[in-house]
Each structure stands twice: as structure tokens, then as C-alpha cells.
Amino acid sequence: SEMCIRDSSNTDMVIKSDRLPKPGETILGGNFLMNHGGKGANQAVAAARLGGDVTFICKIGNDIFGNETLEMFHKEKIDTTYVGITPQEPSGVALINVDKKGENCIVVASGANGTLSTDDIQHAEPAIKQASIVIMQLETPIESVTYAAKMAKKDGITVCLLYTSDA
């Protein structure tokens, strides 16, 4: 594939409210939205929609969120050969509160994302070796990030690490 992206896949649960609650406070919110998310999954979808040939490497749970995510990847024409399904952990979930100014508070339960291992990366070696670029983030175990980066570098493949300080 043209691009190999490895990182997180979450289900985002978003509640909009006038303001963010203070610690220990319950407030009434407005609209509730449930979307597919995770930095890696968002980038894979964006690249595929722009016409990129994308292989995504991640772990999801064997649950309704994982099933819906896998279905979405197929609709977006993302290669899911290396999307691992683990029964030991649920799919990742992010609870997001957004106020009327667009400020947010996010809590992530990594779930299956936290099980992406160097063994998973080794299994995905054919996709990494065929890619022209490997795009990664830091929402999965660092050992799998460094392992994938070294694997790509060894074959002269461009590595792009997208870092956010709040992850």
C-alpha cells in the first residue's frame, strides 16, 4: 500500500454543553454524538478519502464498537488485514465534553489499543515494507511505535511521527 498507518482506534462519545463541569459537579448537556475516532483511525480515514491506498494497523475489541469500526474501515476502503481483534480488552472509548466555545475535556479508556504489541507489528511487516510512508502516533504502547519505526527505517521507508503533548 501507499501508506501504512498504525495507532489507535476509538469510539468517541461527545456531549456538548454550555460550559465544562467543575470537579464533582453534574451539569445538563445538550446534544450527544457518537463517532468513530482515535488519532490513527482519523488519519487513515482522511487519507483514504483523499484517494490514498491505506493499510491500518491497530487493535480493537471483540464488541459492538469494534464491529462498527471494522465495518466503517471497510466502507472507507481501508485495508484491515492488520486490524487485530482481541477478546481480552474492549475497544477504545473516548468521553468528550465540549463547551460552547469549543473547549473540551477528554478521558480515554485505551482498551484494546493498549495491547498493540511488537508481535503485531512483526505480523504486519509485509504492509510496512510495501509502504512509501509509515504514519504513527503515540496513543499505543511506545514499544510498538519504536519497533515499527526501526523496521521502516531499515528499509528506507519514510516515517512520520505525529506527536501531541496531551496524548
Where are these regions (language model features)?
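A short, N-terminal amphipathic alpha-helix
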Residues: 39-53
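Conserved small/polar residues in nucleotide/adenosyl-binding loops
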Residues: 1-7, 163-167
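Glycine-rich beta-alpha junction loops
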Residues: 9-11, 61
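Acidic-glycine-rich active-site phosphate/pyrophosphate-binding loop
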Residues: 12-24
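Conserved beta-alpha-beta core of the PfkB/ribokinase-like small-molecule kinase fold
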Residues: 127, 131-165
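Conserved N-terminal subdomain of the carbohydrate kinase-like
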Residues: 23-27, 34, 49-132
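A short, glycine/small-residue-rich beta-strand->loop->alpha-helix junction that serves as a flexible
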Residues: 32-38
